[in-house]
Amino acid sequence: MAQVDVFKKLVSHCKEYGFVFPSSDIYDGLGAVYDYGQMGVELKNNIKKYWWDSMVLLHENIVGIDSAIFMHPTIWKASGHVDAFNDPLIDNKDSKKRYRADVLIEDQLAKYDDKINKEVAKAAKRFGESFDEAQFRSTNGRVLEHQSKRDALHTRFAKALNDNNLEELRQIIIDEEIVCPISGTKNWTEVRQFNLMFSTEMGSTADGSMKIYLRPETAQGIFVNYLNVQKTGRMKVPFGIAQIGKAFRNEIVARQFIFRMREFEQMEMQFFVKPGTELDWFKKWKEIRLKWHKALGFGDASYRYHDHDKLAHYANAATDIEFLMPFGFKEVEGIHSRTNFDLSQHEKFSGKSIKYFDPELNESYTPYVIETSIGVDRMFLSIMSAAYCEEQLENGESRVVLKLPAALAPVKLAVMPLVKKDGLPEKAREIMDNLKFHFHCQYDEKDSIGKRYRRQDAIGTPYCITVDHQTLEDNCVTLRNRDTMQQERVAISELNNIIADKVSITSLLKTLQ
């Protein structure tokens, strides 16, 4: 099945089973804004707990804060967001659709990659075990031609970004004959910059109002509080501050479901280090963060690093961890060496010293910062897209199953009486009342046991237990595994011991040590 069809089915599945709803749905929705349903909020909370515990519990020198969404407007002037937080946009005159110029060119680069990979795949199939991929890539004429065009485009694109040359970005689109996905034409406007921050007014008109912004990132709330945290927590460099919170960007080209939204949630950690050590720490955090992603069990091939062609104004090194979504490799986390830009700017604009005094060196300095930043919603989408499976069973039936990591699943255990009589519901309720203190359980007695299994498969429940007539005699239940569908008879008294470790976030965290 084509990946685009899989993605459409996933979006439909998210709504049907209570993971994600279009916001304001009864009013025909609001563009690029979504609500998380009863299953989605549980999965999202589990993702956040996995991240938070991996940062704050596993690292003695990382603590958390929760800063306000509204902040003094000068903060955004100091950070560069007022002047430089822009996207290069281009319109197609025929479809009237607006696109990010850089994304159109990145998609063109991806097409060259696809052409090369198709040539490699065909050759691998033709030559079998004797196939030498490295030699083929370096000698095959078609591959070399595609690679040459890609390299030339990449070089030209990177230079245009670094020079902030909007005319050159448009010329690249024209020269590459990039067409509008809607109209299929090459009738493009000029490229222009668009600021992404939402603004509003604080205060009454009578008293004189102040223009403020909805924060476009959570990082600045950490920077302006870093010295408060350092002093009250008696923290020593290197140390980190973690935060989870909402951010807002007026994305003109919001697309791909919850991948790019106007209201979204971030998990960010700013790690403060001694100047001169930042690139070593940058490398270390790259490795730590990739290991965190891979621990979810979706396979090494699903991840890759992508170094930035153009560095942000605050960075001296930056990379993305990309995940293979149904629509290609896309960023789920950014790791940046932000230098001392933010702290120096806030010191300059506030007129207050926020230098750190290092007792070991007996000197004061402005720390450098390594940032790790995840979009919670993108992380949610990557997990859902990797977990979504349509399976054909041996008996000719089919099932849709979410093979979510057990520790992240919204519901850990479903408790089901075989029938709604003969004391089985009462026994099932008794079991659930004991287990619900340990993990999230769901009681289900409606429809046949087969239909109930399918419902639990569809929301990713790792385990189901069935209470039958024999249970009343031997105090044992049937335990079913979601992924294998295998069943075993286990004692009720052993259920917590058998299940708890497999579904706890603690077990996931232990793999990171």
Residue ranges and their predicted role:
Residues 1-513:
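NTP/phosphate- and nucleic-acid-binding module
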